Amino acid sequence: MTGLRAKGIERTFRHASGPVHVLRGVDLEVAPGELVTLSGPSGSGKSALLAVLAGFDRADAGAVEMAGEVLTSPPSWQVCALLPQALGLAGELTLAENVALPLRLGRTGGSLDRATELLEELGIGELAGRYPAEVSYGQQQRAALARAVVGRPEVLLADEPTAHLDQRSAPAAVRVLRRAADAGCAVLVATHHDEVHRAADRTLVLGGGRISVG
């Protein structure tokens, strides 16, 4: 595992009112085994940065490296898992089937059992057979987190993964993130929640299109 590296990331969005320079030469590195949080005010470009890092949006300049290679397209789920705010759960699959999807794509045995274990750890094991439309957004969010970590990717990028969780359910999500890092994953989490920041090894702050150390 080589973790995540980004160098000189630039991203400008063009609107009728003129260009908006969201990212201005962003450099960052997350080593295997690190949980790093990304802070910054709303609209500072955290989601835009995660999309570029995951390969789902193209930077205007700069490079992203994972698994020792420069990204030219979205990496496989074994290399990088992205947990966006738009969760992307498949409506025709149960929560357990959604969580197990990366394992089934990789033809890993015991996928539903592992998925159910993760859902239980996140406090929603009894909902494993429900469909996304039948549960709350916070419960969907926990299922999406389980799906992101189940395949043990080299890099995990998460955008506000505890934003819709209450004080009872958030600690389990934080433990799952911390455990992923402790197992060797490079974890970068955009968050406003103090509990996630406290569990992190360090915090980066995005402001004015640039990264500083929190």
Regions found by a protein language model. Name each.
Residues V20, E69-A81, L105:
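ABC ATPase NBD coupling module
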Residues S39-P41:
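The feature captures the beta-strand-to-loop junction immediately N-terminal to the Walker
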Residues A54:
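Helix-to-loop junction immediately C-terminal to a conserved catalytic motif
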Residues L112-L127:
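Conserved ABC ATPase "signature" region
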Residues Y131-V135, Q139-Q141:
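Conserved ABC ATPase signature
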Residues V150-E154:
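A short, proline-enriched helix->beta-strand linker immediately N-terminal to the Walker B motif
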Residues L156-D159:
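Catalytic Walker B motif of ABC-type/P-loop ATPase nucleotide-binding domains
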